[in-house]
């Protein structure tokens, strides 16, 4: 079985999720396929998780690629951990509303910042879903772990029609 992580360069999210999955016996003999646009982060997360696999003497395997289609090829599960625009865009999500007197506690899921974030993420989420339908297992399951959570999930299910 293969699990593909889109945005695997989100080191904290990816490492935590994989460590949790590796605690489940059914997921210990699996292929984790990591995709990210940052080769540097991709290499780092792959090395960290490979070390976890080796230290625990598990049969899990790792693939890594900056080619999303390659990572999605044959995947049964796809986990989205992306932050479209990175931290620089997130800063704008906070600061632009603040210029107009809208002080939001967090700008990644609610209020004006969440809407801005959604406008960046939804088109890319829909692109991911099209690739999932083309390259992944026929009954693949898309698991969104990226904010704005509700907006991305809604787009994937209602517009892109993925599981």
Region locations from a protein language model:
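Short acidic, glycine/serine/threonine-rich loops at helix termini
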Residues: 16, 44, 90-92, 153-158
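Gly/Ser/Thr-rich loops at beta-strand to alpha-helix junctions
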Residues: 8-13, 39-41, 122, 144-152
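Rossmann-like dinucleotide-binding core of oxidoreductases
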Residues: 126-163
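NAD(P)-binding Rossmann-fold cofactor-contacting core
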Residues: 26-52
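N-terminal Rossmann-like dinucleotide-binding module
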Residues: 3-32
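Short, surface-exposed basic-aromatic patches at helix termini and helix-loop junctions that form
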Residues: 23-26, 50-55, 80, 134, ...
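Rossmann-like NAD(P)-binding element
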Residues: 35-41, 56-135
């Amino acid at each position: 079985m293969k699990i593909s992580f889109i945005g695997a360069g989100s080191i904290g999210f990816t490492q935590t999720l994989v460590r949790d999955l590796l605690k489940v016996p059914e997921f210990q003999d699996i292929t984790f396929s990591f995709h990210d646009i940052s080769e540097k982060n991709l290499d780092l997360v792959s090395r960290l998780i490979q070390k976890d696999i080796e230290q625990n003497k598990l049969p899990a395997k790792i693939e890594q690629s900056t080619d999303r289609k390659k990572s999605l090829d044959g995947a049964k599960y796809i986990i989205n951990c992306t932050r479209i625009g990175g931290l620089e865009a997130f800063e704008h999500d906070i600061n632009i509303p603040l210029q107009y007197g809208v002080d939001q506690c967090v700008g990644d899921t609610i209020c004006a910042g969440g809407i801005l974030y959604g406008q960046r993420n939804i088109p890319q989420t829909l692109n991911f879903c099209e690739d999932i339908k083309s390259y992944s297992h026929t009954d693949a399951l898309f698991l969104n772990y990226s904010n704005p959570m509700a907006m991305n999930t809604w787009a994937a299910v209602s517009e892109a029609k993925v599981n």
